Amino acid sequence: DAETTGALLGLDGTEAVLDEAISSGGNRVISHHPLIFKGYKSITGKDYVERCILKAIKNDIVIYSAHTNLDNAPGGVNYKIAEKIGLKNVRILEPKENCLIKLVTFVPTAQAEEVRNALFTAGCGYIGDYDSCSYNTEGEGTFRAQEGSKPFCGNIGELHHEAEVRIETILPEYKKREVIRTLLLTHPYEEPAYDLYPLYNSWAQVGAGIIGELKEAESELEFLKRIKKTFEVGCLKHNKLTGRLIQKVALCGGAGAFLIPQA
């Protein structure tokens, strides 16, 4: 629960990075690659990873790593590489699956717009390059309020008919708690009815790798030279040149061998 006094951003959480954080008075290191990739039963300082762990503990430094989540995120590592290369019409090479759910709820007609907009603000309704996506059907709901309840409409002990709107929208599963909380706070009913459905749809905005097109086709050698210059690297490792022009490019910020079939 300590306050952050300063943060250092780096690709890896190395000893040199930790030393710089200590000397600059910072207590947080933000890295792309995690320091720990396996479990440890003891920490003795026998290698650089254990030395970094000990140094971080002794100096109250928090190490936060955004690795594959940043690789797969919209606007993350792959998007930035594609942007620097100059790719157009980019899309995810391997979109994530089983990450989306559908929310269905039933709201009195007069309050439907307020609830719907609150759900959009909470993170619902994003499909591709569109937001505020929903499907709405008018219908009639029935209920009988029991003793001890505080009905928004109708009387205790009487069957009530209410004009309602069935609102259907989509959301990423990690937003579920926030969205349901928003629904319960915004919905006028004491006991709002809602359903959640798991979806098998691919989430086109999130996933591994990027594929896109160059504005103009380039020779393989021209493309490789431009990549080398753009990313300021000393050398590039590549396969045998084929003599073809390059127009469509697939990329991955990492090894990416698992994406070769998709590419």
Locations of the language-model features?
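Hydrophobic structural segments
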Residues: 1-263
